[in-house]
Amino acid sequence: MSATEIAVEAAGWGGAALILLAYLLLSLGRLTGQSPLYQWMNVAGAAGFVVNGWWHGAIPSAVLNVIWMLIGGIALWRILARRAASEVPDQGPAQ
């Protein structure tokens, strides 16, 4: 097995582990769907599946995981934007 093949398989198995761990932590109440860590785990896990699926010619799986990444990325962006907006100090009334 070449180094590339090993990296592709590691990406797939690592992606699977991340997505399963994210779901386990969500199900146990250790993370919420609004947790940046939960969303990052899903985005990174899906990226591993995209690499593995594309390499093996599993295009439907790769496309599904690109969409999964987009959903997670958008959710993460919204979570972080909300968090940043809530940290802006109140300027008070204009003088």
Pin down the residues of each PLM region.
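Short, amphipathic, aromatic/basic-enriched membrane-interface segments that mark the entry/exit
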Residues: 28-39
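Short, charged juxtamembrane terminal tails flanking transmembrane helices
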Residues: 85-95
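Alpha-helical transmembrane segments of multipass membrane proteins
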Residues: 20-28, 47-54
